[in-house]
């Protein structure tokens, strides 16, 4: 199985006060097996660094970088994927949809997730 991990999942795993912390940890324990591939994008990593640093501090960023990221395959966004994400964002014209979301959907579509 291939699973895409987004910023909200990373944050829930790190923030003990997050209402989804326990649920996120349980899901990670179930899917963190050699047969599965966990994927995120470099855009999600940047977004996660920013959110974690702002809300939880640099120690949490360090934990994320040193403990979590080594478990995840990072898809590096190329120009074509970026442009597809921008097009999707502008076409959708929805305030709560971000470029990171649109690029994530494009990656998942390309990988058949």
Tell me what each language-model feature is.
Residues 6, 47, 101:
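Acidic active-site catalytic centers that drive phospho-/nucleotidyl reactions
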Residues 50-53, 109:
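Short glycine/serine- and small hydrophobic-enriched flexible loop segments
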Residues 1-39, 53-63:
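Short, well-structured N-terminal submotif of metal-dependent ribonuclease cores
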Residues 74-113:
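Active-site neighborhoods of divalent-metal-dependent phosphate/nucleic-acid chemistry enzymes
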Residues 52, 59-76:
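Helix-adjacent hinge/juxtasegments
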């Amino acid at each position: 199985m291939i699973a895409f991990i987004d910023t909200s999942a990373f944050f829930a795993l790190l923030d003990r006060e997050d209402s989804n912390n326990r649920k996120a940890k349980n899901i990670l324990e179930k899917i963190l097996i050699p047969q599965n591939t966990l994927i995120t994008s470099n855009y999600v990593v940047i977004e996660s660094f920013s959110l974690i640093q702002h809300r939880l501090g640099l120690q949490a960023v360090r934990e994320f970088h040193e403990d979590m990221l080594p478990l995840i395959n990072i898809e590096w966004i190329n120009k074509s994927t970026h442009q597809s994400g921008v097009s999707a964002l502008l076409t959708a014209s929805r305030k709560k949809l971000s470029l990171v979301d649109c690029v994530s959907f494009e990656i998942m579509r390309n990988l058949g997730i």
